[in-house]
Amino acid sequence: MSQIPTMTLGPVLYLWEGEKWRDFYFRIADEAPVTQVFLGETVCSKRFHFTEPHLAEVIERLENAGKQIVLSTLALVTLERESRHVRGLIADSPYPVEANDLSALGMLRGTPHVIGPMVNVYNAATARLLASRGATAICLPPELPVESVNRIVADTPDVEFEVFAFGRMPLAISARCAHARSKGNIKDNCQFVCKDDPDGLAVKTLDQQSFLALNGVQTVSHTCQSLLGELHDLAQAGVSRFRLSPQDCDMVAVARIYDDVLTGRCDADDGIAQMQRIYPGVPLSNGFHHGREGAAWVARARNTAHGANL
């Protein structure tokens, strides 16, 4: 590992009131040890008007704090106005763009850009193809097992790889809005009910066990992926960036814990214990990383004589 990897902050996936969204990023700018911040609505174009009035001042605050800015595209484009928005974003943005939908790739060809975690990069051949078209960094999908991550990174030189290290995992997106339907509304008259669930709406089994969460037209995991115990192994394998996906909790504290573990100021086990206090009520998981079901938690085995991970 030639240098300590950096941390990035992904776009807010949920619908927050504009002032809350603005103040969240103001605090990130002033206090969070992240080097790069992704901004933009990736889930539902109907949410644009909540955040766009605050975007310029958020960017200014982040840039004044030395943060790098990347603008993220929608993850599903179904309407002409959404297509126009993506085209305009790519044509006019003074910042790098993160593609979260294949429809953006043709417009980005030949321009340095980032591939987001909602684009299915499942092998090195795909990563190399994207790199040949201008991708300089790729955030791998959170469902990839570590063996696949290692192989893709090893077989794709000259690309920065990012791993989804914290947050509820984006699993699916639809043209229909199950969140609105769950509240008795339709998508065209949703009344923005997803705003009432700033961390997602729990979906339960018949046995009343939470197993997914709704976020407008998006489905995310009930559990929160946390790769604190895997950071150093991933860094040794060549992963250069770790993405923190905003949840409705103290994300500055989350970023500090990850920074402390990465730099060796804190043991991963202590970091996990702190994380559970910061984000209570949502189970942590790392199952996908270990080739298990995504909701599983695989505890680290320790060599008690040497304190090494097994």
PLM segments and residue spans:
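Active-site pocket-lining/capping segments in soluble small-molecule metabolic enzymes
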Residues: 1-121, 139-140, 146-310
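Residues lining hydrophobic/aromatic ligand-binding pockets adjacent to catalytic sites
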Residues: 135
